[in-house]
Amino acid sequence: DADDKIMTVARELRQSEAEKLLLDMKGHPSPARARGLAMTAVRETFEEAGIIIGGTAADAPAEIAPPSENPSLESPAAKTWRQFRAYGFAPNLAPLTFLARAITPPGRPRRFDTRFFCVEASAITKSTDHNDGELSDLVWMTLTESRELDLPPITRVILEDLAERISKRTLDDPSVPIPYYFNRHGTFRREMLHLAARSA
């Protein structure tokens, strides 16, 4: 969203994560697009779960005022950022770890090219009661507990990727490649995206 690009942040995305986001990026890869993906992750985490991943930014306004002439013209993203900033925080991109990428198989009504991020619990600045209504019955659970749920196959796969990174203590290791899931000729595939492949 265009409004993600103009938000002042407390801390920028780590260079290693920004570079990984550029791997096999379709269209015209750019640092701005990579940053935008991270901004979207922080915004949607607040939007759907009320969780703020933020910090303080000296040059960020205390609040973002809605459009004075016609509030109805305010984009959904701009409205969410205004609500985010009302808690006194600017988005913090530094804790984000780019975990995996997956593309919805062909033939589905809606297809997504999704990037999955994770943060350590200590990066959560505040949990609020903000909720856009898209999700319900939000609860915290362990990875072991999540395995008992009726989850989409790709969600299970991503959670196992997360479990592996946690067990190996590599969440902050910039050299770890990114799992990339997609379908080709009807076959589910997993490729690993390496930073070296981009610099070669």
Predicted regions and their residues:
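Short alpha-helical functional segments enriched in proximate histidine and acidic residues
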Residues: 48-52
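Hydrophobic alpha-helical positions that pack around
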Residues: 45
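Short glycine/proline-centered loop/turn elements that form peptide/ligand docking sites
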Residues: 40, 57-60
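Nudix hydrolase/Nudix homology domain
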Residues: 17-29, 62-200
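Short, His- and charge-rich active-site/binding loops that engage polyanionic ligands
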Residues: 1-23, 35
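Residue-level detector of family-conserved "landmark" positions at structurally sensitive sites
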Residues: 55-56, 94
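Short aromatic-cysteine micro-motif
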Residues: 26-37, 41
